[in-house]
Curated annotation (Swiss-Prot):
InterPro entries: Ribosomal_bS20 (IPR002583), Ribosomal_bS20_sf (IPR036510). GO terms for biological process: translation. The lineage of its organism: Bacteria, Pseudomonadati, Pseudomonadota, Alphaproteobacteria, Rickettsiales. Belongs to the bacterial ribosomal protein bS20 family. This is Small ribosomal subunit protein bS20. Binds directly to 16S ribosomal RNA. The keyword RNA-binding applies. It comes from Ehrlichia ruminantium (strain Gardel). It comes from the Bacteria. The gene is rpsT. HAMAP family: Ribosomal_bS20. Keywords: Ribonucleoprotein, Ribosomal protein, RNA-binding, rRNA-binding.
Amino acid sequence: MANHPSAKKMIKVIKKRTMINRMRKSRAHNYIKKFMAALAAGNKELMLENFKKAESNLHRCVNKKIIHRNTAARKISRLALKLKTFDLQQQEKAS
């Protein structure tokens, strides 16, 4: 347990930052889940909207140093690949 006042304050600050970081990370994951749900439903407009929001939130997490930039790049790349695959499947069905 911290004895110095500055150490006690830092415990409070760290708890607050941890909650904020968790919230930001959770928000990004929720948009990824919404994207996947839209993919399963076949709703392209909703997919595009959630892809943009997920990408934006992942980049924001990188800027705040919550997740590593390579992790965000990998997740965005995989989402983009799923979006592209969905588009190609829709074009094949239309043809």
